[in-house]
From Swiss-Prot:
Record InterPro entries: GAF-like_dom_sf (IPR029016), HrcA (IPR002571), HrcA_C (IPR021153), WH-like_DNA-bd_sf (IPR036388), WH_DNA-bd_sf (IPR036390), WHTH_transcript_rep_HrcA_IDD (IPR023120)
Role noted for this protein: Negative regulator of class I heat shock genes (grpE-dnaK-dnaJ and groELS operons). Prevents heat-shock induction of these operons.
A single MF term (Gene Ontology): DNA binding
Similarity annotation: Belongs to the HrcA family.
Entry-linked SUPFAM superfamilies: GAF domain-like, Winged helix' DNA-binding domain
Name assigned to this protein: Heat-inducible transcription repressor HrcA
GO terms classed as biological process: negative regulation of DNA-templated transcription
Pfam families referenced in this protein's UniProt entry, alphabetically: HrcA
Organism the protein comes from: Staphylococcus aureus (strain NCTC 8325 / PS 47)
Amino acid sequence: MITDRQLSILNAIVEDYVDFGQPVGSKTLIERHNLNVSPATIRNEMKQLEDLNYIEKTHSSSGRSPSQLGFRYYVNRLLEQTSHQKTNKLRRLNQLLVENQYDVSSALTYFADELSNISQYTTLVVHPNHKQDIINNVHLIRANPNLVIMVIVFSSGHVEHVHLASDIPFNNDKLNTISNFVTNKLTEFNQNLQDDIVSFVQSEQEEIFINKLLNTMNNHISNQSNSIYMGGKVKLIDALNESNVSSIQPILQYIESNRIAELLQDISSPNINVKIGNEIDDSLSDISIVTSQYHFDETLKGQIAVIGPTAMHYQNVIQLLNRIW
């Protein structure tokens, strides 16, 4: 345990280091934070914090910077404080869903970009898993001679648009008939479905088209459940360029691999979680990931992540994720 005064000093060091990117000295602390104690007392308390591994000294400066343990202690206190706060939700994600005519993919793309612009960090938003949702309707629209747009409407009200390449010249009436057949058979994905298709179709072309439609729909829903929308990728590169150029490549490889997807999909708690440096991966000592869960309703849920340097404005990001969706 650390004393209240040591906690105040640690908080001040973390916040100054995040704001200015420079190690913090005792004189600077007194000037910026109006600490009503002598420089000698501050230096003594900083020595205690250093012995506890909460702050560390760099060779090029007389100041101190937070260690990973120091950031961890600071963040834990923040999370403890915010867990007791009631916040008014902005419901921005639901607004975007309406604005994009309930197209989930479009809404999440805009949401990732907005989060990045507000937080000034790179953001990831994971598409919700539709396994708990039910397909209510399938509509087919002829876009051009070689393209049919399949509109999938879920029981939650959300919509997915799927492009289906087809040069079979079905008119709109035939497409409506096929749409109604597929919609009626959605609850019968079993061994009898193929027999029903054979009985329903009037040509081999129709049978080929319906089987292609069903396969495309299943593949799309499966793939979308693993989709990740990224906003502000360049922001992470810019932030790391300022501190450690050599760390950029492994971080980008991690984000673009299945490992980040696995990390985010393991989030089952609605609470905000923060992983710092090596807590994420041994090769990622320079970044932090703040994660949370969002939901459109009780069944349709996904994950949000904000990624930045370990010297992140944690308080701003935590408050944002508490309110935005």
